[in-house]
């Protein structure tokens, strides 16, 4: 993570911006689903940050964290619930493959969307966009 921002710093002029969008462990989904959290996504993610750790990283690498936008959606729920039940994202039973053939009703999906919206408002969604500005 530090090396990425160091590389970005070399590419940006002072005042230049960088957007990094990542899953975050300071989220309801991580706390609720643990190893079944769909965004854990091993081995693609070698390290997962919290809101606090990305703030600290920005300071250490001499960036100003301009904004954090939580932008999670219902995927954090249906993907994690599928993993809990042993259903992969590529399964014919997956909501991502066949919404009409999935284990979730439209009512459940609506509740997932509403919960995601509320979690984003509370900065508790499972992913966020971080806007870094080079000092």
Name these PLM-found stretches:
Residues 3, 49, 114:
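Short, conserved clusters of charged catalytic residues that mark active-site
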Residues 2-19:
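A short glycine-rich, Lys/Arg-flanked "PGG" loop and its adjoining helix->strand segment in the class I
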Residues 1-2, 29-32, 67-68, 77-78:
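Extended hydrophobic-aromatic, low-complexity segments
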Residues 70-135:
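A C-terminal cap/extension of S-adenosyl-L-methionine-dependent methyltransferases
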Residues 20, 65-70:
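Acidic/polar loop patches that form or flank catalytic/metal-binding clefts of enzymes
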Residues 18-47, 52-59, 83:
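Short, glycine-/aromatic-enriched active-site segment of Class I SAM-dependent methyltransferases
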Residues 11-13, 57, 61-63, 134:
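A structural motif corresponding to the C-terminal end of an alpha-helix
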């Amino acid at each position: 993570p530090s090396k990425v921002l160091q590389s970005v710093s070399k590419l940006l002029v002072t005042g230049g911006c960088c957007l990094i969008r990542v899953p975050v462990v300071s989220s309801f989904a991580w706390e609720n689903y643990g190893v079944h959290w769909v965004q854990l996504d091993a081995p693609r993610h070698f390290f997962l940050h919290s809101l606090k750790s990305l703030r600290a990283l920005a300071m250490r690498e001499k960036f100003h964290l301009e904004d954090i936008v939580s932008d999670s959606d219902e995927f954090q729920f249906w993907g994690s619930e599928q993993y809990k039940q042993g259903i992969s994202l590529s399964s014919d039973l997956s909501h991502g493959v066949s919404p009409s053939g999935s284990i979730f009703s439209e009512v459940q999906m609506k509740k997932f969307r509403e919960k995601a919206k509320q979690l984003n408002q509370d900065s508790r969604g499972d992913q966020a966009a971080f806007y870094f500005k080079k000092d």
